Structure formats: C-alpha cells, structure tokens
Amino acid sequence: MAKKNRKNINILDLFSGIGGFSLGIKNTGVKINKHYFSDIDKYANKTYKRRFPNATELGSIENVSYKKLKGEKIDLLTGGFPCQAFSIAGKRRGFEDTRGTLFFEIARILEDYIKNGKPIPCILLENVKGLLSHDNKRTFITIYKILTDLNYTLECQVVNTRWFLPQNRERIFIFGRYNGGTSGRKVFPIGKNDIKFSSKKINIVGHSGTGGQRGDIHSIDGIMSCLSATDYKQPKQVLTHSLYPRSSKTGKGGTGHLTKEDGTAYCLDTGNAQAVEYNSSIRKLTPTECERLQGFPDGWTDGQSDTQRYKQLGNAVSVPVIEAIARKIYDL
C-alpha cells in the first residue's frame, strides 16, 4: 500500500485524453496540487473534467506557454503525443504529418520554461513502438537529440501492458530529468520481475442482448491485444480479426481464432474491432470491458456514446503502466 501524499507535484498533462497519466500518478499516492491539461478532443475533455474537476483546461497545445500558465512551476510534464503519424498500422508519414509535428510543441514548451528560469524537472512521454523504427530511426534520433539538447538526461524503454493487464500493447516510454536531476535512481527498466501487479483475467460483463446474441458471456481466458486508434465507422472490421480459440474449429462463417497459442488474443481498437466467442456466436467487447483492459475503473467514460467511449479508451495509456513508472520516478 502506497503512503498517501508522500509527494506533492504540479503536473502539465499534454495530449491528455481521458487522464490515464494523471490517474496512474494519483494511484501511487502522489498528490497533484496544480493540475493542468491540454487536448483538443471535446469529448475526451468532458471525461477528463468529470474525473479531475480541479484541473485547469488549457485548450490546444499550441496555446500552452509559460505565460499562459502565469509562470506556475511545473514538476512533471506528461504527454502521449499523437502516434498515428508513426504507427505501423497507419501511413507512417512521421514529421511530414501535421500530427507528427506536435512533438515540436512539447519541445517549445520545455524551452519556454528553461528560458524563463523554471525548467521542468521531469518529463514522461509515450508513443507507439513504431516510433523507434520510423524513417530508418531518424525520427526517434531527432526527438532524442532535441530533448538532450534541452539538457534532459533520457531513459527509454518499450513497455508491454501485458505485464500488468491482459492486453498485448507495446509502447515506447521516454523519461527525462533536466540536467540529470538530483536522483541517481533509474526509472527503467521495468518488467515482469519489477512490478507489483498481476495480469488478472478481465471478467466479461453480463450478457449480450444485441445483434441477435443471447445468453451469458464467459470470462476472457487469455490476453487481449492492443486497443488502438481506428475509425469507429468501420464496424465490419470486427470480422477481420481472428475470432475463435485455437482449441476449437472455425465454424460456419468464422474467420479464424480468438487467441494465439500463448493465450494472447487479437487487437481491440477504438471502433471495438474485437469480439468474444460464445457458443459459436460473437459480440463486441463492451466499453466497461475495454475500461478494464486499460486499467480504468468501471464507468470512467460513461455518460457518452459508445462510439466516443471506444475511441477514448483506444487512445488512452494503460493506467497500471503509468503507475509503475511513477513509483520508480518518485521512489515509492
């Protein structure tokens, strides 16, 4: 059990989504005093403000600056900057894509604080694993050089959500301390032998009564794959993934298997393009099940359409991963 309020910090949460970074930090017992967040998704912002009512909304990252924050000290900057430009599943245009250039907004804010004599001591950034290999590694090298030129000492690791939750989701995390920081403790690596969480199975909620499906739905037995950002307007994608366990035969109309040989199932995305098999019938996972697969409390995104809930959860960071990293940052 973490000691409550052992640390008190001011946080700037960029590309904040539904608050996965802030929730993970809060779960360690760290107290967030001044709390700022920035995102342009009005639906995600609605969820964020509901769950963190004392946080200050800043709007687009392009409006965030030392002056905008009135010179407020920031102890930790977090950001899962847009990953579509670097995603293996996307077009991988990188910095040619407008979304890819938003990293430079992070660098601008860091430099702004440095120039005003209040450098942000810690940064924690997240992106898809594909960032490492994009453009023959030049994209990652550029990001690394920009941050080190700003005098941040960096640590990086690809972390898999499956070490914490039954979802196979690999993400690159970049942690930096300004001027090397005052702590000699390394944040990375984290791994199976370093975490205090167990990959518990996620119970399927209730039963499905839609789309002709009836009956109680069984628990997931294995590990789901990645919740990712896709267009919800492609409902047919639910049939492009493997749907049946390898231990069972593909029935009439089936398209494959539900789980891999190692118990890992295939990809969930923001359109909920993942299914559960029951008596040779299929249904999508519910938003609550997706919340559990990302480590959020049940109902974290409720009050909005399922379309928005799937999108928000697919774009979110996995909460227990952030919690594990934060425990290393603050030596908890």
Residue locations for each model-derived region?
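Conserved Class I SAM-dependent methyltransferase catalytic core
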Residues: 101-178, 182-185
